[in-house]
Amino acid sequence: MSNSAMSVVILAAGKGTRMYSDLPKVLHKLAGKPMVQHVIDAAMTTGAQHVHLVYGHGGDLLKHELTDPALNWVLQAEQLGTGHAMQQAAPYFADDEDILMLYGDVPLISSQTLGRLRQTKPQGGIGLLTVKLDDPTGYGRIVRENGAVVGIVEHKDASEEQRQINEINTGILIANGKDLKRWLSQLNNNNAQGEFYITDIIAMAAEEGQRVEAVHPERLSEVEGVNNRLQLSALERVYQREQADRLLLAGVMLLDPARFDLRGELTHGRDVVIDVNVVVEGNVKLGNRVKIGAGCVIKNSIIGDDCEISPYSVLEDAVLDAECTVGPFARLRPGSELAEGAHVGNFVELKKARLGKGSKAGHLSYLGDADIGSGVNIGAGTITCNYDGANKHKTVIGDDVFVGSDSQLVAPVSVANGATIGAGTTVTHDVAENELVVGRVKQRHISGWQRPVKKK
Protein backbone atom coordinates (compact mmCIF):
# COMPACT_ATOMS: atom_id res chain seq x y z
CA MET A 1 0.00 0.00 0.00
CA SER A 2 1.23 3.48 -0.89
CA ASN A 3 0.59 6.51 1.30
CA SER A 4 2.25 8.98 -1.06
CA ALA A 5 0.64 12.02 -2.61
CA MET A 6 -0.74 11.33 -6.07
CA SER A 7 -1.22 13.01 -9.44
CA VAL A 8 -3.17 11.72 -12.44
CA VAL A 9 -2.26 11.66 -16.13
CA ILE A 10 -5.12 11.28 -18.63
CA LEU A 11 -4.13 10.35 -22.18
CA ALA A 12 -6.46 12.12 -24.62
CA ALA A 13 -4.37 12.85 -27.71
CA GLY A 14 -5.88 10.34 -30.13
CA LYS A 15 -7.74 11.50 -33.22
CA GLY A 16 -10.36 8.77 -33.21
CA THR A 17 -10.30 8.00 -36.93
CA ARG A 18 -12.89 5.24 -36.61
CA MET A 19 -15.44 7.68 -35.19
CA TYR A 20 -15.60 9.33 -38.64
CA SER A 21 -16.05 12.72 -37.01
CA ASP A 22 -14.50 16.18 -36.92
CA LEU A 23 -14.82 16.05 -33.14
CA PRO A 24 -11.90 14.64 -31.11
CA LYS A 25 -12.83 11.16 -29.94
CA VAL A 26 -12.76 11.92 -26.23
CA LEU A 27 -15.31 14.73 -26.67
CA HIS A 28 -18.00 12.39 -27.93
CA LYS A 29 -20.65 12.23 -25.25
CA LEU A 30 -21.74 9.41 -22.99
CA ALA A 31 -24.76 10.14 -20.79
CA GLY A 32 -24.76 13.74 -21.90
CA LYS A 33 -21.15 14.67 -21.19
CA PRO A 34 -17.83 14.08 -22.97
CA MET A 35 -16.18 10.72 -22.36
CA VAL A 36 -13.06 12.40 -21.03
CA GLN A 37 -15.12 14.39 -18.53
CA HIS A 38 -16.23 11.11 -16.94
CA VAL A 39 -12.56 10.21 -16.54
CA ILE A 40 -11.70 13.65 -15.14
CA ASP A 41 -14.55 13.35 -12.63
CA ALA A 42 -13.28 9.94 -11.49
CA ALA A 43 -9.74 11.33 -11.21
CA MET A 44 -10.92 14.25 -9.08
CA THR A 45 -12.45 11.85 -6.54
CA THR A 46 -9.10 10.15 -5.89
CA GLY A 47 -7.64 13.09 -4.02
CA ALA A 48 -5.13 13.78 -6.79
CA GLN A 49 -3.02 16.88 -6.30
CA HIS A 50 -2.72 17.48 -10.04
CA VAL A 51 -4.50 16.22 -13.16
CA HIS A 52 -2.37 16.34 -16.33
CA LEU A 53 -4.31 16.04 -19.60
CA VAL A 54 -2.18 14.93 -22.56
CA TYR A 55 -3.78 16.22 -25.75
CA GLY A 56 -2.98 16.35 -29.45
CA HIS A 57 -5.70 16.43 -32.10
CA GLY A 58 -8.38 19.07 -31.65
CA GLY A 59 -6.67 20.88 -28.82
CA ASP A 60 -8.69 24.06 -29.26
CA LEU A 61 -11.95 22.12 -29.14
CA LEU A 62 -10.83 20.29 -26.02
CA LYS A 63 -9.86 23.48 -24.23
CA HIS A 64 -13.16 25.10 -25.18
CA GLU A 65 -15.15 22.19 -23.78
CA LEU A 66 -13.04 21.34 -20.72
CA THR A 67 -12.75 24.52 -18.68
CA ASP A 68 -11.73 23.18 -15.28
CA PRO A 69 -8.82 25.39 -14.16
CA ALA A 70 -7.35 22.46 -12.23
CA LEU A 71 -6.34 20.73 -15.48
CA ASN A 72 -2.71 20.95 -16.58
CA TRP A 73 -2.58 20.78 -20.38
CA VAL A 74 0.30 18.77 -21.87
CA LEU A 75 0.79 18.73 -25.65
CA GLN A 76 1.73 15.53 -27.49
CA ALA A 77 2.43 16.95 -30.94
CA GLU A 78 3.10 13.52 -32.48
CA GLN A 79 1.25 10.38 -31.42
CA LEU A 80 4.07 7.88 -30.97
CA GLY A 81 2.52 5.60 -28.39
CA THR A 82 1.45 5.58 -24.76
CA GLY A 83 5.02 5.68 -23.51
CA HIS A 84 5.71 8.74 -25.63
CA ALA A 85 2.58 10.42 -24.27
CA MET A 86 3.73 9.81 -20.70
CA GLN A 87 7.18 11.17 -21.57
CA GLN A 88 5.54 14.51 -22.42
CA ALA A 89 3.99 14.68 -18.96
CA ALA A 90 7.05 13.38 -17.08
CA PRO A 91 8.60 16.83 -16.41
CA TYR A 92 5.63 17.56 -14.15
CA PHE A 93 6.11 14.45 -11.98
CA ALA A 94 7.44 14.89 -8.45
CA ASP A 95 9.85 12.22 -7.22
CA ASP A 96 7.89 11.56 -4.05
CA GLU A 97 4.41 11.27 -5.55
CA ASP A 98 2.55 8.42 -7.20
CA ILE A 99 1.38 8.82 -10.79
CA LEU A 100 -1.92 7.26 -11.86
CA MET A 101 -2.32 6.76 -15.61
CA LEU A 102 -5.82 6.86 -17.15
CA TYR A 103 -7.34 7.07 -20.63
CA GLY A 104 -9.79 9.64 -21.95
CA ASP A 105 -11.62 7.03 -24.04
CA VAL A 106 -12.23 4.62 -21.14
CA PRO A 107 -15.13 6.54 -19.61
CA LEU A 108 -16.66 4.18 -17.06
CA ILE A 109 -13.68 3.66 -14.76
CA SER A 110 -14.97 4.02 -11.20
CA SER A 111 -13.48 5.86 -8.27
CA GLN A 112 -13.90 2.67 -6.21
CA THR A 113 -11.69 0.65 -8.55
CA LEU A 114 -9.10 3.43 -8.66
CA GLY A 115 -9.11 3.49 -4.88
CA ARG A 116 -8.43 -0.25 -4.73
CA LEU A 117 -5.67 0.09 -7.31
CA ARG A 118 -4.03 2.79 -5.24
CA GLN A 119 -4.29 0.65 -2.13
CA THR A 120 -2.79 -2.33 -3.99
CA LYS A 121 0.32 -0.52 -5.21
CA PRO A 122 3.36 -1.62 -3.20
CA GLN A 123 5.63 1.01 -1.65
CA GLY A 124 8.16 0.23 -4.36
CA GLY A 125 6.81 -1.03 -7.66
CA ILE A 126 3.69 -0.77 -9.77
CA GLY A 127 -0.03 -1.27 -9.29
CA LEU A 128 -1.64 -2.64 -12.45
CA LEU A 129 -5.28 -3.04 -13.47
CA THR A 130 -5.88 -6.27 -15.41
CA VAL A 131 -8.83 -8.40 -16.53
CA LYS A 132 -9.34 -11.91 -17.83
CA LEU A 133 -11.16 -12.33 -21.15
CA ASP A 134 -12.55 -15.35 -22.95
CA ASP A 135 -11.18 -13.86 -26.18
CA PRO A 136 -8.11 -11.70 -25.51
CA THR A 137 -7.27 -11.19 -29.20
CA GLY A 138 -5.72 -7.80 -29.84
CA TYR A 139 -4.82 -7.04 -26.24
CA GLY A 140 -1.51 -6.97 -24.43
CA ARG A 141 -0.98 -10.16 -22.38
CA ILE A 142 0.12 -10.24 -18.73
CA VAL A 143 3.20 -12.44 -18.45
CA ARG A 144 3.74 -14.10 -15.07
CA GLU A 145 6.46 -16.25 -13.58
CA ASN A 146 5.56 -18.23 -10.47
CA GLY A 147 2.48 -16.03 -10.13
CA ALA A 148 4.37 -12.74 -10.19
CA VAL A 149 3.82 -10.24 -13.01
CA VAL A 150 7.07 -9.89 -14.93
CA GLY A 151 5.98 -8.19 -18.14
CA ILE A 152 3.35 -7.27 -20.70
CA VAL A 153 3.64 -8.29 -24.33
CA GLU A 154 1.50 -6.66 -27.01
CA HIS A 155 -0.57 -8.97 -29.20
CA LYS A 156 1.39 -8.20 -32.38
CA ASP A 157 4.65 -8.95 -30.60
CA ALA A 158 3.44 -12.04 -28.69
CA SER A 159 4.48 -15.61 -29.41
CA GLU A 160 1.84 -18.29 -30.03
CA GLU A 161 2.30 -19.49 -26.46
CA GLN A 162 1.87 -15.99 -25.05
CA ARG A 163 -1.26 -15.47 -27.13
CA GLN A 164 -2.90 -18.28 -25.15
CA ILE A 165 -2.77 -16.10 -22.01
CA ASN A 166 -6.23 -14.69 -21.21
CA GLU A 167 -5.20 -12.09 -18.61
CA ILE A 168 -4.83 -8.78 -20.39
CA ASN A 169 -3.55 -5.32 -19.68
CA THR A 170 -6.13 -2.53 -19.35
CA GLY A 171 -3.44 0.16 -19.62
CA ILE A 172 -4.35 1.67 -16.26
CA LEU A 173 -1.49 1.69 -13.76
CA ILE A 174 0.06 3.57 -10.87
CA ALA A 175 3.77 4.01 -10.11
CA ASN A 176 6.14 6.23 -8.18
CA GLY A 177 7.08 9.45 -9.99
CA LYS A 178 10.84 9.03 -9.62
CA ASP A 179 10.76 5.42 -10.80
CA LEU A 180 8.42 6.27 -13.65
CA LYS A 181 10.66 9.04 -14.98
CA ARG A 182 13.63 6.68 -14.95
CA TRP A 183 11.76 3.94 -16.80
CA LEU A 184 10.28 6.35 -19.33
CA SER A 185 13.75 7.60 -20.22
CA GLN A 186 14.77 4.02 -21.07
CA LEU A 187 11.92 3.25 -23.47
CA ASN A 188 12.59 2.40 -27.11
CA ASN A 189 10.38 1.73 -30.12
CA ASN A 190 11.89 -1.57 -31.25
CA ASN A 191 8.56 -3.30 -31.82
CA ALA A 192 6.10 -4.16 -34.58
CA GLN A 193 4.25 -0.86 -34.20
CA GLY A 194 7.34 1.33 -34.02
CA GLU A 195 5.89 3.01 -30.93
CA PHE A 196 6.99 3.67 -27.36
CA TYR A 197 4.98 1.32 -25.15
CA ILE A 198 4.30 2.30 -21.55
CA THR A 199 3.85 -1.42 -20.92
CA ASP A 200 7.62 -1.96 -21.26
CA ILE A 201 8.08 -0.44 -17.81
CA ILE A 202 6.57 -3.57 -16.25
CA ALA A 203 9.54 -5.68 -17.35
CA MET A 204 11.92 -2.91 -16.21
CA ALA A 205 10.38 -2.95 -12.74
CA ALA A 206 10.55 -6.74 -12.56
CA GLU A 207 14.21 -6.74 -13.63
CA GLU A 208 14.95 -4.29 -10.81
CA GLY A 209 13.27 -6.64 -8.36
CA GLN A 210 10.32 -4.32 -7.78
CA ARG A 211 6.92 -5.88 -7.25
CA VAL A 212 4.08 -5.50 -9.72
CA GLU A 213 0.70 -6.08 -8.09
CA ALA A 214 -2.39 -6.64 -10.23
CA VAL A 215 -5.98 -5.87 -9.28
CA HIS A 216 -9.19 -6.48 -11.22
CA PRO A 217 -12.03 -3.96 -11.74
CA GLU A 218 -15.43 -4.68 -10.26
CA ARG A 219 -17.01 -4.70 -13.73
CA LEU A 220 -15.53 -5.32 -17.17
CA SER A 221 -17.31 -2.23 -18.52
CA GLU A 222 -15.05 -0.06 -16.35
CA VAL A 223 -12.07 -0.76 -18.58
CA GLU A 224 -13.74 -1.00 -21.97
CA GLY A 225 -12.44 1.61 -24.39
CA VAL A 226 -14.20 3.39 -27.22
CA ASN A 227 -12.82 3.36 -30.76
CA ASN A 228 -16.05 3.68 -32.74
CA ARG A 229 -19.66 4.73 -32.34
CA LEU A 230 -20.87 1.15 -31.93
CA GLN A 231 -18.69 0.72 -28.85
CA LEU A 232 -19.81 4.10 -27.54
CA SER A 233 -23.48 3.21 -27.89
CA ALA A 234 -22.86 -0.12 -26.14
CA LEU A 235 -21.24 1.62 -23.17
CA GLU A 236 -24.09 4.15 -23.12
CA ARG A 237 -26.53 1.27 -22.62
CA VAL A 238 -24.34 -0.27 -19.92
CA TYR A 239 -24.15 3.03 -18.08
CA GLN A 240 -27.88 3.72 -18.37
CA ARG A 241 -28.79 0.26 -17.14
CA GLU A 242 -26.49 0.70 -14.14
CA GLN A 243 -28.17 4.01 -13.30
CA ALA A 244 -31.62 2.51 -13.75
CA ASP A 245 -30.78 -0.42 -11.48
CA ARG A 246 -29.47 1.96 -8.83
CA LEU A 247 -32.67 4.03 -8.92
CA LEU A 248 -34.89 0.94 -8.81
CA LEU A 249 -33.06 -0.33 -5.74
CA ALA A 250 -33.48 3.11 -4.16
CA GLY A 251 -37.26 2.96 -4.60
CA VAL A 252 -37.90 4.76 -7.90
CA MET A 253 -40.41 2.92 -10.10
CA LEU A 254 -39.10 2.92 -13.66
CA LEU A 255 -41.83 1.34 -15.76
CA ASP A 256 -39.23 0.17 -18.28
CA PRO A 257 -35.60 0.49 -17.11
CA ALA A 258 -34.35 -0.09 -20.65
CA ARG A 259 -36.14 3.07 -21.82
CA PHE A 260 -34.86 5.62 -19.31
CA ASP A 261 -31.91 7.97 -19.79
CA LEU A 262 -30.10 9.77 -16.98
CA ARG A 263 -27.67 12.43 -18.19
CA GLY A 264 -26.77 14.03 -14.90
CA GLU A 265 -27.80 13.63 -11.26
CA LEU A 266 -31.26 12.70 -9.98
CA THR A 267 -32.28 13.04 -6.34
CA HIS A 268 -35.72 11.84 -5.37
CA GLY A 269 -38.25 11.23 -2.64
CA ARG A 270 -40.41 8.18 -2.04
CA ASP A 271 -42.83 6.49 -4.44
CA VAL A 272 -41.65 8.30 -7.56
CA VAL A 273 -42.98 6.79 -10.81
CA ILE A 274 -41.27 7.41 -14.16
CA ASP A 275 -42.83 6.17 -17.39
CA VAL A 276 -40.97 5.12 -20.55
CA ASN A 277 -38.63 7.22 -22.69
CA VAL A 278 -38.03 9.90 -20.07
CA VAL A 279 -34.74 11.85 -20.26
CA VAL A 280 -33.33 13.45 -17.11
CA GLU A 281 -30.53 15.98 -17.70
CA GLY A 282 -28.34 18.04 -15.38
CA ASN A 283 -29.36 18.26 -11.72
CA VAL A 284 -32.96 17.24 -11.12
CA LYS A 285 -34.78 16.88 -7.81
CA LEU A 286 -38.09 15.03 -7.53
CA GLY A 287 -40.19 15.14 -4.37
CA ASN A 288 -42.36 12.40 -2.91
CA ARG A 289 -44.99 10.72 -5.09
CA VAL A 290 -44.00 12.57 -8.25
CA LYS A 291 -45.25 11.04 -11.50
CA ILE A 292 -43.44 11.65 -14.78
CA GLY A 293 -45.28 10.65 -17.95
CA ALA A 294 -43.89 9.02 -21.06
CA GLY A 295 -41.52 10.95 -23.30
CA CYS A 296 -40.80 13.84 -20.94
CA VAL A 297 -37.49 15.72 -20.80
CA ILE A 298 -36.59 17.17 -17.39
CA LYS A 299 -33.47 19.33 -17.12
CA ASN A 300 -32.05 21.16 -14.09
CA SER A 301 -35.44 21.36 -12.40
CA ILE A 302 -36.99 20.95 -8.96
CA ILE A 303 -40.39 19.24 -8.80
CA GLY A 304 -42.25 19.21 -5.49
CA ASP A 305 -44.31 16.55 -3.74
CA ASP A 306 -47.35 15.08 -5.51
CA CYS A 307 -46.70 16.79 -8.84
CA GLU A 308 -47.69 15.09 -12.06
CA ILE A 309 -45.95 15.77 -15.36
CA SER A 310 -48.04 14.37 -18.20
CA PRO A 311 -46.51 12.86 -21.35
CA TYR A 312 -44.23 14.71 -23.77
CA SER A 313 -43.63 17.77 -21.62
CA VAL A 314 -40.27 19.56 -21.52
CA LEU A 315 -39.03 21.30 -18.36
CA GLU A 316 -35.76 23.22 -18.13
CA ASP A 317 -34.55 25.23 -15.14
CA ALA A 318 -38.05 25.15 -13.69
CA VAL A 319 -39.23 25.06 -10.07
CA LEU A 320 -42.56 23.49 -9.13
CA ASP A 321 -44.10 23.58 -5.66
CA ALA A 322 -46.29 20.73 -4.42
CA GLU A 323 -49.33 19.36 -6.25
CA CYS A 324 -48.70 21.02 -9.61
CA THR A 325 -49.81 19.45 -12.86
CA VAL A 326 -48.10 19.98 -16.20
CA GLY A 327 -48.95 18.85 -19.71
CA PRO A 328 -49.31 16.89 -21.81
CA PHE A 329 -47.19 18.64 -24.44
CA ALA A 330 -46.27 21.58 -22.20
CA ARG A 331 -42.98 23.47 -22.16
CA LEU A 332 -41.50 25.19 -19.13
CA ARG A 333 -38.44 27.17 -20.17
CA PRO A 334 -35.75 28.59 -17.87
CA GLY A 335 -37.10 30.76 -15.08
CA SER A 336 -40.53 29.13 -14.91
CA GLU A 337 -42.00 28.82 -11.41
CA LEU A 338 -45.25 27.16 -10.41
CA ALA A 339 -46.70 27.75 -6.94
CA GLU A 340 -48.63 25.06 -5.09
CA GLY A 341 -51.46 23.53 -7.08
CA ALA A 342 -50.79 25.47 -10.28
CA HIS A 343 -51.71 23.88 -13.59
CA VAL A 344 -50.06 24.23 -17.01
CA GLY A 345 -51.93 22.33 -19.70
CA ASN A 346 -51.38 21.12 -23.22
CA PHE A 347 -49.44 23.32 -25.65
CA VAL A 348 -48.74 25.98 -23.04
CA GLU A 349 -45.26 27.55 -22.93
CA LEU A 350 -43.79 29.48 -19.99
CA LYS A 351 -40.55 31.47 -20.00
CA LYS A 352 -39.37 33.50 -16.99
CA ALA A 353 -42.92 33.30 -15.73
CA ARG A 354 -44.35 32.68 -12.27
CA LEU A 355 -47.79 31.09 -11.95
CA GLY A 356 -49.29 31.63 -8.50
CA LYS A 357 -51.04 29.22 -6.15
CA GLY A 358 -53.93 27.42 -7.80
CA SER A 359 -53.62 29.39 -11.04
CA LYS A 360 -54.32 27.66 -14.33
CA ALA A 361 -53.23 28.02 -17.94
CA GLY A 362 -54.98 25.12 -19.58
CA HIS A 363 -54.47 25.39 -23.31
CA LEU A 364 -52.51 26.89 -26.18
CA SER A 365 -50.88 29.86 -24.45
CA TYR A 366 -47.54 31.65 -24.27
CA LEU A 367 -46.65 33.31 -20.96
CA GLY A 368 -43.25 34.99 -21.07
CA ASP A 369 -41.69 37.45 -18.63
CA ALA A 370 -44.84 37.32 -16.52
CA ASP A 371 -45.68 37.41 -12.81
CA ILE A 372 -49.12 35.88 -12.33
CA GLY A 373 -50.86 35.83 -8.96
CA SER A 374 -52.94 33.15 -7.26
CA GLY A 375 -56.34 31.89 -8.36
CA VAL A 376 -55.88 33.19 -11.92
CA ASN A 377 -57.50 31.62 -14.96
CA ILE A 378 -55.61 32.03 -18.23
CA GLY A 379 -57.92 31.28 -21.15
CA ALA A 380 -56.92 29.30 -24.21
CA GLY A 381 -54.84 31.21 -26.74
CA THR A 382 -53.64 33.89 -24.32
CA ILE A 383 -50.32 35.53 -25.17
CA THR A 384 -48.17 37.90 -23.16
CA CYS A 385 -46.56 40.02 -25.88
CA ASN A 386 -43.22 40.53 -24.15
CA TYR A 387 -40.92 41.50 -27.04
CA ASP A 388 -41.01 44.81 -28.93
CA GLY A 389 -38.39 43.81 -31.46
CA ALA A 390 -35.50 45.02 -29.33
CA ASN A 391 -36.25 44.49 -25.64
CA LYS A 392 -38.27 42.22 -23.38
CA HIS A 393 -40.98 43.65 -21.10
CA LYS A 394 -42.90 42.26 -18.14
CA THR A 395 -46.58 41.49 -17.61
CA VAL A 396 -47.93 41.53 -14.04
CA ILE A 397 -51.28 39.90 -13.29
CA GLY A 398 -52.75 40.08 -9.80
CA ASP A 399 -54.77 37.53 -7.81
CA ASP A 400 -58.15 36.15 -8.92
CA VAL A 401 -57.90 37.57 -12.43
CA PHE A 402 -59.87 35.97 -15.27
CA VAL A 403 -58.29 36.24 -18.70
CA GLY A 404 -60.63 35.23 -21.51
CA SER A 405 -59.58 33.13 -24.46
CA ASP A 406 -57.59 34.58 -27.35
CA SER A 407 -56.42 37.61 -25.38
CA GLN A 408 -53.14 39.46 -25.86
CA LEU A 409 -51.44 41.43 -23.10
CA VAL A 410 -48.93 43.85 -24.63
CA ALA A 411 -46.13 44.39 -22.11
CA PRO A 412 -45.25 46.34 -20.13
CA VAL A 413 -48.70 46.08 -18.60
CA SER A 414 -50.33 45.32 -15.23
CA VAL A 415 -53.69 43.77 -14.44
CA ALA A 416 -54.86 44.33 -10.86
CA ASN A 417 -56.58 41.87 -8.52
CA GLY A 418 -60.02 40.62 -9.48
CA ALA A 419 -60.02 42.08 -12.99
CA THR A 420 -61.66 40.32 -15.93
CA ILE A 421 -60.32 40.39 -19.48
CA GLY A 422 -62.99 39.59 -22.04
CA ALA A 423 -62.25 37.01 -24.71
CA GLY A 424 -60.45 38.36 -27.75
CA THR A 425 -59.20 41.50 -26.00
CA THR A 426 -55.86 43.15 -26.70
CA VAL A 427 -54.72 44.81 -23.46
CA THR A 428 -52.33 47.73 -24.02
CA HIS A 429 -52.95 49.75 -20.83
CA ASP A 430 -53.00 48.85 -17.14
CA VAL A 431 -56.25 47.40 -15.81
CA ALA A 432 -57.58 48.50 -12.40
CA GLU A 433 -58.86 46.23 -9.63
CA ASN A 434 -62.14 44.43 -10.36
CA GLU A 435 -62.51 46.06 -13.80
CA LEU A 436 -63.92 44.33 -16.85
CA VAL A 437 -61.95 45.08 -20.01
CA VAL A 438 -63.33 44.22 -23.43
CA GLY A 439 -61.57 45.32 -26.60
CA ARG A 440 -62.81 43.34 -29.58
CA VAL A 441 -64.00 44.34 -33.04
CA LYS A 442 -67.74 45.14 -33.21
CA GLN A 443 -69.71 42.16 -34.49
CA ARG A 444 -71.56 42.68 -37.81
CA HIS A 445 -74.50 40.67 -39.16
CA ILE A 446 -74.96 40.49 -42.96
CA SER A 447 -78.20 38.85 -44.04
CA GLY A 448 -78.42 36.84 -47.25
CA TRP A 449 -74.68 36.29 -47.47
CA GLN A 450 -73.65 34.19 -50.45
CA ARG A 451 -70.54 32.09 -50.07
CA PRO A 452 -68.00 32.19 -52.89
CA VAL A 453 -67.99 29.20 -55.21
CA LYS A 454 -65.01 27.63 -56.90
CA LYS A 455 -64.33 28.62 -60.46
CA LYS A 456 -64.55 25.75 -62.92
From Swiss-Prot:
A GO term from the CC aspect: membrane
Region (Linker): 230-250
Signal peptide: none
Keywords: Acyltransferase, Cell shape, Cell wall biogenesis/degradation, Cytoplasm, Magnesium, Metal-binding, Multifunctional enzyme, Nucleotidyltransferase, Peptidoglycan synthesis, Repeat, Transferase
Region (Pyrophosphorylase): 1-229
Residues that, per the record, bind acetyl-CoA: 380, 386-387, 405, 423, 440
Cofactor: Mg(2+)
Record InterPro entries: Bifunctional_GlmU (IPR005882), GlmU-like (IPR050065), GlmU_C_LbH (IPR038009), Hexapep (IPR001451), Hexapep_transf_CS (IPR018357), MobA-like_NTP_Trfase (IPR025877), Nucleotide-diphossugar_trans (IPR029044), Trimer_LpxA-like_sf (IPR011004)
Keyword Acyltransferase belongs to the record: yes
Name of the protein this chain belongs to: Bifunctional protein GlmU
Gene giving rise to this polypeptide: glmU
